[in-house]
A protein has these predicted regions:
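Folded, non-transmembrane soluble domains that reside on the lumenal/extracytoplasmic side of membranes
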Residues: 20-162
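Residue-level detector of intrinsically disordered/flexible regions characterized by low predicted structural confidence
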Residues: 5-6, 21
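Bacterial N-terminal signal peptides
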Residues: 7-17
Length: 162
């Protein structure tokens, strides 16, 4: 009985380890190769370590029509994303149903990713997106995000409640 219980516990720990190994990429639409996922995860790791923000990439075919923004925001809110007390982070969604990309930010990331910078981030991967090179598009998006983080917050920026 003890051997069976030990084997079961080891199996559960292995399952949990595998589930947590790729926490920055949820490729529900099946757009990325294994190599692309590895590179995307490495860039996310680098950003997370340097800036203490959570980075997450999500792809989906199942976003309801006209709900891309709400889907991204809700996914961030209800899936435990974000670091620290302010749940700082960024989610990048590729919505294949509505044919849209969206960035959702929380915490300190709001201060770094202004509307203008968000457009620059989306533009960085646009050509690859049009060519259906989704993995390369995300890599460019993340590298542009990292560039803006290195530049720091823009002067004169402020937040207001919507």
């Amino acid at each position: 009985m003890v051997k069976k219980l030990t084997a079961f516990l080891l199996l559960m720990m292995l399952t949990l380890t595998v589930a947590l190994a790729d926490t920055q990429v949820q490729d529900d639409a099946g757009l990325f190769t294994a190599d692309e996922i590895a590179e995307i995860s490495a860039i996310c790791d680098r950003i997370e370590s340097a800036y203490q923000v959570d980075m997450f990439v999500l792809t989906s075919h199942d976003v309801p029509s006209g709900r891309t923004t709400a889907y991204a925001d809700d996914y961030f809110d209800y899936n435990g994303l974000g670091m620290g007390d302010d749940r700082a982070g960024m989610l990048y969604l590729i919505d294949m149903h509505n044919r849209q990309c969206w960035i959702s930010t929380r915490g300190v990331m709001i201060d770094y990713i202004t509307d203008e910078r968000e457009e620059g981030i989306l533009d960085a991967g646009w050509d690859e997106m049009l060519d259906k090179e989704y993995g390369q598009s995300v890599i460019k998006v993340l590298k542009q995000t990292e560039k803006y983080l290195k530049q720091g917050r823009t002067s004169g920026q402020f937040r207001y409640d919507e």
